[in-house]
């Protein structure tokens, strides 16, 4: 993170001493118990998707909290791990919208410019949202603000009420917002299914003269 192009711009959006506070927090929680993702994957979203490559942002809430699932990219799991319910529904909507993606691992999206950002970057094992206590949100809000400042158009995909609250941070009119209910089984049938976010995103990117995302890769 220290050497990425993100660092200085994110730092400008944060209070003095915030990075030291985050470092102290991580030292403490990783020493106390099982935390996901592995520490070297905490900043995976911004490490995998350089700022100048960002074309799409998909905002999640916090990492998966089961063994071997979280890899620092929202909604993504390694291929050897079964897809959790929300990811199953994302892949089902993708199949209906564009075509079948075989992989559960969304790293290929991240490498194409899809920033897979969780609002909280860590979670204790089997304790969903336990770190949604304000420690991470200044950081992830700063990431969104930095992307908002880009002079090239970006698609923000906001699934569910939590992600939709981030719309207040997206003030640059060149960007495009796609919103729907969350892909969770609790809400997917209330408007996520049939929303076609993937083809919508590509139509916008192509209209702006940008390369579309190969969502099936």
Swiss-Prot record:
Primary location recorded for the protein, binned into one broad class: cytoplasm
Which Gene3D superfamilies does the UniProt record give? Uracil-DNA glycosylase-like domain (3.40.470.10)
Q: Where is the signal peptide?
A: none
Q: What is its EC number?
A: 3.2.2.27
Catalysed reactions listed for this entry: Hydrolyzes single-stranded DNA or mismatched double-stranded DNA and polynucleotides, releasing free uracil
Keyword presence, Thylakoid:
no
Alphabetical list of Pfam families matching this protein: UDG
| Function field | Excises uracil residues from the DNA which can arise as a result of misincorporation of dUMP residues by DNA polymerase or due to deamination of cytosine.
* Protein name according to UniProt: Uracil-DNA glycosylase
The scientific name of the source species is: Streptococcus mutans serotype c (strain ATCC 700610 / UA159)
Taxonomy-wise, where does this protein's organism fall, top ranks first?
Bacteria, Bacillati, Bacillota, Bacilli, Lactobacillales
The UniProt gene name for this protein comes to ung
């Amino acid at each position: 993170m220290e050497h990425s192009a993100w660092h200085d711009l994110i730092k400008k959006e944060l209070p003095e001493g915030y990075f030291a506070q985050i470092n102290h927090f991580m030292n403490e929680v990783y020493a106390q118990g099982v935390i996901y993702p592995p520490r070297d994957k905490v900043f995976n979203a911004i490490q995998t998707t350089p700022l100048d490559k960002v074309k799409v942002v998909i905002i999640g809430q916090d990492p998966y909290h089961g063994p071997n699932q979280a890899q620092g990219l929202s909604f993504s799991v390694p291929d050897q791990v079964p897809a959790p319910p929300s990811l199953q529904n994302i892949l089902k909507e993708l199949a209906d919208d564009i075509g079948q993606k075989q992989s559960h691992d969304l790293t290929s999206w991240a490498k194409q410019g899809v920033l897979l950002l969780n609002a909280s970057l860590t979670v204790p094992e089997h304790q969903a949202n336990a770190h949604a206590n304000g420690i991470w949100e200044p950081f992830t809000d700063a990431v969104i603000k930095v992307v908002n400042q880009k002079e090239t158009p970006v698609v923000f995909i906001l699934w569910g009420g939590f992600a939709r609250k981030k719309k207040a941070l997206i003030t640059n009119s060149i960007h495009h917002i796609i919103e729907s209910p969350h892909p969770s089984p609790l809400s997917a049938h209330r408007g996520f299914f049939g929303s076609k976010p993937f083809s919508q995103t590509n139509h916008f990117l192509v209209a702006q003269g940008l390369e579309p995302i190969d969502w099936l890769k």
